[in-house]
Regions:
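N-terminal membrane-targeting hydrophobic helices
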Residues: 1-160
Length: 160
């Protein structure tokens, strides 16, 4: 799932939360709901692990992260949020599960004993990912990204 979509959903839900903990929690939980839907990047991740060649995957993540910054930096700077602190916490909550999963998967410079402690979360994240996605296992990346961009545009339109 695009980081931009996780961030947008978390920020939007955080904006409607009544407390900082609720904003963060709603963003965090929204991550798993979104990950249940097929998004077409599954094969890139599997190919990256199988071949060790992650250039395409890293480019996608880099472009996605840049898009998220391009959207949210101006939104926060220009006062687009009524409750910016709650939106920010929701945004962080929406991104945190992927960050936690990236630690044991990609951060080999972290001591193994610390990575092992996160394996249960990694297994849970993969389980959530594979529930609905299994039905759409062969979805092309272009269709998955198009679906997410449409969803992001709908959220943006409804939020305005």
């Amino acid at each position: 799932m695009l980081l931009t979509l996780h961030a947008a959903t978390g920020a939007m839900l955080g904006e409607f939360a009544s407390t900082p903990a609720a904003a963060f929690g709603l963003g965090f939980l929204s991550h798993f709901v979104l990950d249940m839907f097929p998004h077409g990047d599954r094969m890139i991740a599997h190919d990256t692990k199988a071949t060790g060649n992650g250039k395409r995957y890293y480019w996608l993540v880099g472009i996605d992260a840049f898009a998220a910054l391009a959207i949210f930096f101006p939104a926060f700077a220009l006062g687009r949020f009524d409750h910016p602190w709650l939106a920010y916490l929701g945004l962080l909550g929406g991104l945190l599960p992927d960050l936690i999963v990236a630690i044991p998967e990609y951060a080999l410079y972290i001591k193994k004993e610390y990575r092992v402690r996160l394996r249960w979360f990694y297994a849970f994240h993969v389980y959530v990912h594979d529930q609905l996605i299994r039905v759409f296992d062969g979805m092309p990346l272009k269709i998955g990204i198009a679906f997410q961009v449409i969803l992001l545009a709908l959220m943006w339109r409804l939020w305005r």
